[in-house]
Design a protein with these regions (language model features):
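A conserved active-site-flanking secondary-structure segment within enzyme catalytic domains
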Residues: 334-386
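Flexible phosphate-sensing "switch/lid" loops adjacent to ATP/NTP-binding sites
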Residues: 1-315, 322, 375-487
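Catalytic nucleophile serine of serine hydrolases
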Residues: 327
Length: 487
């Protein structure tokens, strides 16, 4: 292979899901960017319900964060295959556009090779335009039951990448998982190992590190302490826990929830309590209820109705709670949904909390980076930016915001709806706009007789820099550079 850049590609493997691959990629991208190296992220295939919009359409939110770390604009070339699970099937996004919905077996048997070739072309484009591509693997490269895994060894060997193995010591059994992984995989270009999430005396690990070097000839590049980084996690849905605070914000835990990054910012805001409601009674005494996005809007609306969530949401609204619907949640709050695409159930009544909002689904999806300002009288004029990913068009009258830009194109259109204490919007990332979020939290605080506060929210760049600085101190960056640099 002829390398277009100055460096061989670098792939980050993990001993398991959740080992810290995304974190390591993010840190290295920022470190190399700081060094003046033109670096970009790449992940062949990502299975995630957290999606965003980059150049070319829809892509995994993790690679959008990584592009930010590299200080480049996110592109669908960085995540050519996005798998979004729904029921017993998988919704496939290929190079930013909807490709089809398949059972896992059908996708593995009939589509994977065809799609992989397209993904490899995306990698080659990135490699030709940048100095260094850092690839994030998926899960573990040692899944011996999978003979057609395209996200780990296949891509690594096809592009002749050098590798780093990330191991999570917090779970226990770290040395066994490293030894097992290295024994099971046939990969001769491993630079070294990064041990992640360590708490305690590092010297206690040195004997094990010496064993790994004797057995495999591979050194440990660094030991990373446990970091409270507050970056969005691909699998963070599994880690939801209740958070206490005088302001109670309740998130309705939909069966087919999508884009739960929309409210992760509340995890880091002091005195804000978070409840991820699995039962209607958990919504009681809420100050704010958020109905999030959904992969299957009508199915989730019917679930809310059947399980008693709709009645409780309406009761909380009457008691003064602020109700917010984002994307599919917005559609559910309206008067009705006409769905001949997803559920094919035709006209379905909504919750009617936004009675001027009526939605009809169409077989195409809108994916845009959007910029606007708020029209709601409580928060009028605040500038917001985010992205929209949705099927369907919603007609309303009392618009929540005015959009003035889509991507690089200046336009004039409107988004969402509001009525008193109910807001519906297609703006994913709404609460990442910290000036608006501070105003919103203080509005809720004032209603409860609490003093206004200045929110202490670190920007995404500040959080990335904090992680990168730890890695600079703890990881042998020079060895990595020496191994991948093309002489």
């Amino acid at each position: 292979m002829v390398y277009q850049g100055k460096y061989r590609p670098l792939i980050i493997f993990g001993t398991s899901s959740g080992a810290g691959k995304s974190l390591v990629v993010t840190a290295l991208l920022r470190i190399f960017s700081d060094m003046g190296i033109d670096t970009v992220p790449f992940k062949v295939q990502n299975m995630s319900l957290n999606a965003g919009v980059g150049i070319g359409g829809e892509m995994a939110y993790a690679q959008i964060i990584q592009a930010r770390a590299a200080r480049v604009y996110p592109s669908v070339l960085m995540n050519p295959i996005l798998l979004k699970p729904e029921e017993n099937k998988t919704h496939v996004i290929l190079v930013g556009k909807y490709y089809g919905t398949f059972s896992s077996g059908d996708y593995m048997r009939s589509k994977k090779e065809e799609i992989y070739k397209i993904a490899l072309e995306c990698f080659n484009r990135l490699q030709s335009e940048h100095e260094l591509v850092i690839i994030e693997g998926a899960g573990s490269p040692a899944e011996i039951n999978l003979d057609n895994d395209i996200a780990n060894l296949r891509i690594a060997k096809d592009v002749k990448a050098k590798g780093i193995l990330v191991a999570d010591i917090e779970r226990g059994g770290m040395f066994a998982s490293v030894v097992g992984t290295l024994e099971l995989i046939d990969f001769r270009d491993m630079i070294g190992i990064i041990v992640n999430k360590f708490r305690g005396d590092e010297s206690l690990l040195y004997k094990g590190y010496e064993f790994l070097e004797r057995k495999f000839g591979i050194t440990v590049l660094g030991t990373i302490p446990y970091i409270e980084h507050n970056l969005p996690e691909e699998d963070s849905l599994a880690n939801w826990t209740k958070k206490e605070g005088r302001i109670k914000i309740s998130i309705v835990k939909l069966p087919h929830i999508a884009n739960f990054t929309d409210f992760e910012i509340f995890e880091s805001i002091e005195d804000v309590g978070l409840v991820y409601a699995k039962k209607p009674e958990e919504l009681k005494n809420s100050d704010v209820i958020i109905v999030p996005g959904s992969k299957l809007t009508v199915a989730d609306l019917e679930y809310l109705r059947k399980e008693g969530f709709e009645d409780e949401i309406k009761k909380q609204y009457r008691d003064g709670a602020f109700i917010i619907g984002i994307c599919g949640g917005y559609q559910m709050l309206g008067k009705y949904i006409i769905d001949n695409v997803e559920s094919k159930k035709g006209k379905v009544l909504g919750m009617n909390l936004l009675e001027d909002s009526k939605t009809e689904f169409f077989p195409y999806k809108k994916t845009n980076r959007i910029f606007g300002h708020i029209l709601h009288p409580y928060f009028y004029g605040y500038k917001i930016e985010g992205y929209e990913i949705h099927m369907g068009i919603t007609i309303s009258r009392n618009y929540f915001s005015k959009i003035y830009r889509e991507g690089n194109r200046y336009i004039k259109r409107f988004d969402g709806s509001y009525y008193k204490n109910v807001i519906g919007t297609y703006f994913h990332g709404l609460f990442d706009n910290t000036k608006f979020t501070e105003s919103f939290i203080n509005y809720i605080r004032e209603r409860k007789g609490l003093d206004k506060v200045k929110l202490k929210i670190e920007s995404l760049d500040e959080r990335i820099n904090k992680i990168a600085n730890i890695f600079k101190k703890k990881v042998d960056i020079k060895k990595i550079i020496d191994e991948i640099k093309i002489s």
